[in-house]
């Protein structure tokens, strides 16, 4: 936000791009009486921002990839990348409209026009990656505000090298590189027998949310597998 006036923007737009439209009256904001349970002001709005997601987060990323061979789940994993303090989960969405009869109560999917679609309407957010508070002088809607963003970093380098080791058949070296990333996050360490291309890409999802062009990476590895005739790719 220290940029000159003419060079400033509302910021990173991470809250806009990744957060759900929890505040929107047409679909997500209704209370049990059909009125507004959520509003775009006050508590929640100052931190969750004005989401309008271009990238909807799914339950696979929020829940499934945090399971491990030690029987941890997203609820009890020691992995800091899924620590409760770092995420904003579904049960933490609290109706913030003082005029609502459900003010202060948790979001209820049954209030939606289509309750079965709740998983795409209100979903967990890796808040530690997407939230940057507005500058005190910033008057634009909270959309992620101004902050630094990764271009590249060591964790991705380790995971790229781990993948290279995997293609060469050296799963021991691959596990060592993956464990450098997992150890930093306090996640349970793995062994060479755990290493396959699926695990490597799950680890990329756990570590590199918002940092990698994931579709491009999946396409890249699909071409490699097709070239090698692996797993039905041709």
Where are the model-predicted features located?
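Aromatic-residue-lined binding/catalytic grooves and analogous aromatic/hydrophobic interfacial grooves
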Residues: 1-48, 165, 170-186, 190-193, ...
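Elongated scaffold/linker segments in the mid-to-C-terminal portions of large proteins
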Residues: 1-153, 233-234
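Residue-level signal for the start and early helices of compact helical domains
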Residues: 73, 141-143, 148, 191, ...
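Extended, hydrophobic/aromatic-rich amphipathic alpha-helical segments that build helical scaffolds
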Residues: 79-84, 148-183, 197-207
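Residues that form or immediately flank small-molecule/cofactor binding pockets and catalytic motifs
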Residues: 87, 205, 223
